[in-house]
């Protein structure tokens, strides 16, 4: 299993683990992204997904270039789309 991490708009990455040690709770993910979550399935062999703020573009959150590159490389978003705000990448099985 790959590590779980946050990608911040400034490009920094931080490894994270679920508070309960097993699965990420909804409230935990909402706190990290700053609002309601949107789950973006990544098309990779590691069964990962990207969690972002569902309303991030409406809130004018900062563009997250690193997360956008990952989402584009996985063909998880359209070419004209982009990611804003904090992005969390976790194993899909750790979504509660």
For each feature predicted by the language model, list its residue ranges:
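Detector for the mature cores of small, proteolytically processed
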Residues: 1-32, 36-96
